[in-house]
Amino acid sequence: MSQNLKKKNKSYKETLHTLNIKEDSEKQITLLTEKIKSLQKHFLENKNDLHSRRGLLKKVSRRRKILNYLKRKNKMRYFDLIKKLNLRN
């Protein structure tokens, strides 16, 4: 396993542990948020990378769909997760 992948897995597990996340949909949202943040850093250096931009938009769309599902199923967990991940103002 590459060093970069080990580092990403470690940061993901630490995030799950510190935020006390146990449900699958919340884990998926957290993982997508981590990937979106790393892609945002990538775009600061590579503004014209349109292929990666499409991947970013797909990840944002996927996260939005899972968030909508979570909001429908359990509003309290939805609002807690939004607060923990600082997704809304």
From Swiss-Prot:
Gene Ontology biological process terms from the UniProt entry: translation
The keyword Ribonucleoprotein is assigned to this record: yes
Alphabetized GO MF terms: rRNA binding; structural constituent of ribosome
Keywords linked to the UniProt accession: Ribonucleoprotein, Ribosomal protein, RNA-binding, rRNA-binding
Keyword match Cell inner membrane: no
CDD domains: S15_NS1_EPRS_RNA-bind (cd00677)
Pfam families from the UniProt entry: Ribosomal_S15
Family annotation (PANTHER family): RIBOSOMAL PROTEIN S15, BACTERIAL AND ORGANELLAR, SMALL RIBOSOMAL SUBUNIT PROTEIN US15M
Function: One of the primary rRNA binding proteins, it binds directly to 16S rRNA where it helps nucleate assembly of the platform of the 30S subunit by binding and bridging several RNA helices of the 16S rRNA. Forms an intersubunit bridge (bridge B4) with the 23S rRNA of the 50S subunit in the ribosome.
Family: Belongs to the universal ribosomal protein uS15 family.
Subunit structure: Part of the 30S ribosomal subunit. Forms a bridge to the 50S subunit in the 70S ribosome, contacting the 23S rRNA.
Protein name as it appears in the record: Small ribosomal subunit protein uS15
Lineage: Bacteria, Pseudomonadati, Pseudomonadota, Gammaproteobacteria, Enterobacterales
